[in-house]
Regions:
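Asp-based, Mg2+/Mn2+-dependent phosphohydrolase catalytic module
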Residues: 1-26, 31-46, 58-82, 89-268
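Conserved phosphoryl-transfer catalytic core
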Residues: 49
Length: 268
C-alpha cells in the first residue's frame, strides 16, 4: 500500500491530481454542525477523483449521513459513506457465529448495522450475548453500560466503534464515545477492539470499498484522521477548519504529523 501510495511529483499538478481517492472526514472538515464549511461544496465539486466520506460517528446510518451531506449541497450518496458502525459490525461478523446475540450500546442505527451482517442486536446481557458493540448515543446511561459490563465480564467479545474522548457540538466539545468506553474499561479491566480512526480497520475498509491505489486522507484532527492515515501508510492532509491547529502540528508527535496542511479544502 505504501509503495502504491507514493505519488509521482509534478510541479504542474494540483494536490488532488496526485491522488485517485479522497477519504474525507465530516465534522470540522466538510461541515460544522448544520452548516457546510465555507467553500467546501465548491472545492469538492472541482475534483474528478472519487470522494468517500469516512466517519467515526456510529450514531447515524450511511443513508442518513449521505442525506445530510446532500442537503448541505454535496454531491454524494450512501455508497460513498463509510461509518465506524459498519466496520464494527463487520469485525463482529468475522469473529462470532451468524445469529449470535450482541449487546448494542448505541443508537438504533448501530443496531441495524449489526442486524445487516446476520447478528442479533439485543439490549441485555441475559439474552445470550456473546459480544458487545459500543458506539455513541446521546441516550447512553448507566443501565446499558451495566449490561455491557456484565456481558464482557462474562467473556463476551467487545468492539468499540471509536474511542474519541470528545464529540464536537455547536456549543463546544462534549463527551464522546471514548468517555463511555473508559467507564466500561474501568469496570471490566478489558480493552476493546476498535473499528474507527486512528485504528486501521476503518481505513482498510474505506480503501477496499473505494478501490483506491493512491488515497489521500483529509481531516481536521491529528489524533484520529492524521494518526489513522499514518498508521496505515496513507498520505494525509490536515485542514485547519476544525479541532487541530497549526500550533498543534508543530507540537505533534511524528505519528500525528500530516504530509500536507491547508487552511481549508481550497488547498486541494
Amino acid at each position: 500500500m505504501s509503495a502504491a501510495n507514493e505519488p509521482i511529483a509534478s510541479p504542474a499538478a494540483t494536490l488532488r491530481e496526485l491522488f485517485d481517492v479522497l477519504l474525507l472526514d465530516l465534522d470540522g472538515t466538510v461541515y460544522q454542525g448544520k452548516n457546510p464549511i465555507e467553500g467546501a461544496v465548491d472545492a469538492l465539486r472541482l475534483g474528478s477523483e472519487k470522494q468517500y466520506f469516512v466517519t467515526n460517528n456510529a450514531s447515524r446510518s450511511p443513508s442518513d449521513v449521505a442525506e445530510h451531506l446532500v442537503d448541505l449541497g454535496f454531491d454524494t450518496s450512501e455508497k460513498f459513506v463509510v461509518t465506524s458502525a459498519q466496520v464494527a459490525a463487520r469485525m463482529l461478523a468475522e469473529r462470532i457465529p451468524a445469529g449470535s446475540a450482541v449487546v448494542v450500546v448505541g443508537t438504533d442505527a448501530l443496531a441495524q448495522e449489526v442486524a445487516l451482517v446476520g447478528l442479533k442486536p439485543v439490549r441485555s446481557a441475559d439474552e445470550g450475548a456473546v459480544a458487545v458493540v459500543q458506539g455513541h448515543s446521546a441516550e447512553t446511561g448507566w443501565s446499558i453500560l451495566a449490561e455491557a459490563t456484565l456481558a464482557i465480564r462474562g467473556g463476551a467479545l467487545w468492539v468499540a466503534a471509536n474511542t474519541d474522548a470528545t464529540l464536537p457540538t455547536e456549543r463546544g466539545l462534549a463527551p464522546g464515545n471514548g468517555a463511555m468506553v473508559s467507564a466500561v474499561r474501568a469496570a471490566t479491566g478489558q480493552e476493546p477492539l476498535v473499528a474507527g480512526k486512528p485504528a486501521a480497520p476503518i481505513m482498510d475498509d474505506a480503501i477496499r470499498s473505494s478501490g483506491a491505489r493512491r488515497p489521500l486522507v483529509v481531516g481536521d484532527r491529528l489524533d484520529t484522521d492524521i494518526a489513522g492515515a499514518n498508521a496505515t501508510a496513507i498520505a494525509s492532509l490536515l485542514v485547519l477548519t476544525g479541532v487541530s491547529s497549526a500550533v498543534d502540528v508543530l507540537r505533534a508527535d511524528h505519528s500525528e504529523r500530516p504530509h500536507h496542511i491547508g487552511f481549508d479544502l481550497d488547498i486541494l
